[in-house]
């Protein structure tokens, strides 16, 4: 049930963004075995001039926020972070050193799923 929001510098062609979406999806399925039908990913593009890394304005970087149901192990989360970071580097060429992944765990009572019900009500 992972929901990913990616902050990506503007300027990448649509084909690269599609490749990134596919790569991120594979990263999620490969690392935490989430069912494909439960994965949601959106790209939010940010002008490079609106970013700063280590005091340097305009340094390309990627921030990925992952919202998911609590319960994954520390190792699964580490694998997810590694897979997502590699997917960014492989798909759009932004260094793994300039990618950050933030994981937010939600209890099953605090996350809505298909049908407008909580994950708990859906049987998760």
Q: Where are each of the predicted segments found?
A:
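A domain-level signal for the structural core that forms small-molecule/cofactor-binding pockets
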Residues: 2-124
């Amino acid at each position: 049930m992972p929901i990913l929001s990616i902050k990506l510098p503007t300027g990448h062609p649509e084909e690269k963004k599609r490749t990134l979406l596919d790569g991120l999806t594979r990263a999620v399925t490969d690392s935490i075995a989430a069912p494909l039908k439960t994965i949601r990913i959106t790209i939010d593009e940010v002008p490079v001039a609106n970013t700063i890394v280590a005091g340097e304005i305009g340094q390309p970087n990627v921030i990925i926020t992952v919202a998911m149901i609590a319960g994954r192990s520390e190792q699964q989360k580490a694998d997810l972070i590694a897979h997502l970071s590699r997917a960014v580097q492989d798909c759009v060429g932004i260094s793994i050193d300039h990618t950050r992944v933030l994981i937010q765990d939600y209890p099953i009572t605090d996350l809505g799923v298909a049908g407008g019900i909580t994950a708990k009500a859906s049987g998760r």
